[in-house]
Amino acid sequence: GSDLVSGFWGKVDAHKIGGEALARLLVVYPWTQRYFTTFGNLGSADAICHNAKVLAHGEKVLAAIGEGLKHPENLKAHYAKLSEYHSNKLHVDPANFRLLGNVFITVLARHFQHEFTPELQHALEAHFCAVGDALAKAYH
């Protein structure tokens, strides 16, 4: 599974996919906007989809998820600092990690329709789930 994801990941444009996915998360699950109060105008779907801070942060998030592919046996240690930050500083509900993973799957399927096989989806879902679990580690 992870070889399949690693091979696919090289085709993923973190800027385009990450920005679109985070924007989609904020539109589809509006309560997640409370974590982004410093990002400026989130008043409409259009504003969110064109918000430079949302797009840049989405790229950063997707790049961090991609970094996890280099540490498949050690995700919890790899994401320990990010887990603490999201738990202790940002107080992000860990259920949101699963929502974001689902949104990433949706956006990737949209962009890579022809190569988005059930096997790839399964492998991607396993990776996003493992990353979400690692990020939730600091929660008590």
Curated annotation (Swiss-Prot):
Residues annotated for heme b binding in this entry: 57, 86
Top-level taxon of the source organism: Eukaryota
Domain Globin: 1-140
Pfam families per record: Globin
Claim: Aminoacyl-tRNA synthetase is one of the keywords in the record: no
Annotated keywords: Heme, Iron, Metal-binding, Oxygen transport, Transport
Gene Ontology BP term (one): hydrogen peroxide catabolic process
Cellular component aspect of the GO annotation: blood microparticle; haptoglobin-hemoglobin complex; hemoglobin complex
GO molecular function: haptoglobin binding; heme binding; metal ion binding; organic acid binding; oxygen binding; oxygen carrier activity; peroxidase activity
Expression (tissue specificity): Red blood cells.
Signal peptide region: none
Function as written in the Swiss-Prot or TrEMBL entry: Involved in oxygen transport from the lung to the various peripheral tissues.
Family assignment from sequence similarity: Belongs to the globin family.
Assembly, per entry: Heterotetramer of two alpha chains and two beta chains.
Name under which the protein is recorded: Hemoglobin subunit beta
